[in-house]
Design a protein with these regions (language model features):
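Cleavable N-terminal export/targeting peptides
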Residues: 1-39, 332-355
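Subset of outer-membrane beta-barrel
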Residues: 38-355
Length: 355
């Protein structure tokens, strides 16, 4: 029967020419299979906000479409690639209470043939608590599929004495593809200056169905920030903003925890940020320290962001950090918003950074 140990042996025999980093990639894959799975941590959480909390659906724009690409551990053969497409819509109906969203996410590892595809539908309800404070509550229902492509491996019993490959393996390949349903919820309390986000993903802890019936553990998060304006944008079409926004967050999933704190500075049309992350991994691995550098550009309804994770610890530095690129198309009618403001029917503009 195939287990994580034989999987490592298969990878090692199949790619004996790798340098040490290649074997490390295989060990990481085997660890991921034999331990509870983890969700990807995006370095531009406000660009990928629907992934972080369904209550962000419809919070920033009348509608938006965002494409995110993340290449993690680029120094390893194949690395770990995440591609995400997110879209949300807040219909212009009386009260503007409702918003809908769609989230498509794919994780894959080129070294091990591992892929995980998740498709989610989101709904958020928005309401004003006072003239200056509003609340958004959201729900997320996702369908996921996880699989391993065995044609990426060469097992020991396939290697003849002269080093050639001979026939299929006799290993029992029992990591069948797994389908699962995941439920999540969240809330965002916000004003035009600050926000507090609370979210829980995978509340039903779906089984991933691999050999040990491992579960996808709950992801719990709490984050927030406050924006200080030097130049505050007006209600018209032509606006200019100069501001700085300190942010902080706590995240926990399975045996992994993460805390972070950072600062974003916006001088229209450019946003720059730096976020420190302290990550505690399961299995007795030492704390990993990262510094995330973010740079974004806004031009009309287009947003383009790039970030790089700089490893401050030995392991994270050896793995090469992560590159992340986001491209967003969004629409927000400032004139209509000004009209609603005059009639006291407007919500506060959420002050979260764009990236």
């Amino acid at each position: 029967m195939l287990n994580a140990q034989s999987l490592v042996c298969a990878c090692y025999r199949g790619w004996s020419g790798w340098r040490a980093a290649g074997l490390l990639a295989v060990l990481l894959l085997a660890t991921a299979i034999s331990s509870p799975a983890q969700d990807v941590y995006f370095s531009q959480p406000f660009a990928s906000r629907l992934h972080a909390n369904p209550a962000f659906t419809g919070l920033f724009d009348d509608y938006s479409v965002t494409l995110s690409f993340r290449d993690q551990f680029p120094y390893l053969p194949g690395s770990f690639i995440t591609t995400q497409l997110a879209a949300d819509l807040r219909p212009n109906v009386p009260g503007q209470h409702h918003a809908l969203g769609l989230l498509l996410n794919q994780d894959r590892s080129g070294t091990g043939g591992y892929t995980r595809l998740e498709m989610g539908a989101l709904y958020a309800y928005h309401t004003r608590l006072t003239e200056k404070i509003a609340l958004s509550g959201g729900l997320r229902v996702s369908y996921g599929r996880q699989r391993i492509a065995y044609n990426s491996f060469v097992f020991g019993d396939q290697i003849a004495a002269d080093g050639t490959l001979s026939g299929p393996t006799a290993e029992v390949l029992d990591f069948a593809p797994v389908n699962y349903l995941s439920l999540g919820t969240g809330a965002v309390l916000y004003s035009s200056r600050g926000w507090l986000s609370l979210a829980g993903q995978h509340l039903n802890q779906p089984s991933l169905g691999f050999q040990q019936q491992s579960q996808l553990p709950m992801l719990l998060s709490a984050s927030g920030g406050y924006k200080f304006f030097i130049v505050e944008p007006g209600a018209g079409v032509a606006t200019r903003e100069i501001s700085y926004t300190p942010v902080a967050g706590l995240f926990h999933q399975g045996g992994s925890s993460r805390s972070e704190a950072g600062l974003y500075v916006t001088t229209s049309p450019i946003t720059a940020g730096a976020v420190y992350r302290n990550i505690l991994l399961p299995g007795g691995v030492a704390h990993q320290h990262l510094l995330v550098a973010v740079l974004g550009l806004q031009a009309g309804g287009l947003r383009l962001g790039y970030s790089y994770d700089v490893g401050l610890s030995r392991l994270s530095a050896d793995l090469g950090g992560a590159h992340e690129v986001t491209l967003a198309l969004r629409a927000f009618d400032r004139l209509e918003n000004a009209h609603r403001r005059l009639k006291r029917r407007v919500y506060p503009v959420a002050p979260c950074p764009a990236f």
